[in-house]
Amino acid sequence: DVYKRQFNQQTNVALDNKYIVLDISELTGDLLTVGMFVALDFVWDKAKENRTAEKAIFVDECWQLIGASSNRQAAESVLELAKTIRGYGGSLVCATQDLNDFFALDDGKYGKGIINNSKTKILLNLEEEEAQRVQGVLHLSEAELMEITHFERGSALISTNNNNIAVEIKCSQMEKELITTDRRELAELAQRAAPKQH
C-alpha cells in the first residue's frame, strides 16, 4: 500500500529532457531500496535506448548504493552499469565522500569493481585510513599517499591509465555558485536572488 502511494502515479517530470535528475534523498528504509531500483532501472533503460548518443550518468553519494548497509542487488546493478555503460556510448560518474563505506560491502567487491572499471579517478583530500585503503587499488606511491592526506580545498589527484597527477582545480564564479555547499555562500546567494522590497 505504501509502494502504491509512492510509485503508482503519473510523473511530473519531463522524461525526454536533455538533463534528468532523480532525487531519492528523502526516501528511507525499504522505500530507499525500491527507489534506488526504480531509478537505476529507468536510467539503465534510457542509456540503452540509443547506442550512438553520448550520455553520462551521475550517481552522487554512491556509498548509499554499495555501502555496508546497502542492498546487494542495488550494488550489483551499479557495478553492472560501471562495467557495461561504455558499450552504450556512455559514462558513469560515481561520487562519494566516504571511501570507507565505498569499500564496506562484501570486502570492497563493489567499490573495487567500480574503481577498476573507471578510466579516470579524481581524489580530493582523504583521511589517512581512506588513503591507505585506496593506495593499493590505484597503485599510489608513498609520496602521493602523503599528498592526498594534506590536500587543501581545490586540490586533487587525477588518476588515469595508472598515471597520477596532482592538480589545482579553479572554477569560475558561476560554477562556484552552482556547486557550493558552504552555508554562508548559499545564504548570500539566496539573499541576492530574493525580490527586493521597496
Question: Which residue stretches match the model-derived regions?
Answer:
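Polar low-complexity intrinsically disordered regions
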Residues: 2-3, 113, 169, 196-198
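Short acidic, S/G/P-rich loop/turn micro-motifs used as interaction or catalytic elements
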Residues: 27-29, 64-66, 99-101, 129, ...
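Short acidic, gly/pro-rich beta-turn/loop elements at beta-sheet edges
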Residues: 32, 168, 179
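Conserved ATP-driven motor cores of ASCE-family P-loop NTPases powering translocation/secretion/packaging/pilus
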Residues: 69, 73-75, 79-172
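Short, surface-exposed linear segments at secondary-structure transitions and domain or protein termini
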Residues: 174-185
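Acidic, low-complexity intrinsically disordered tails
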Residues: 186-198
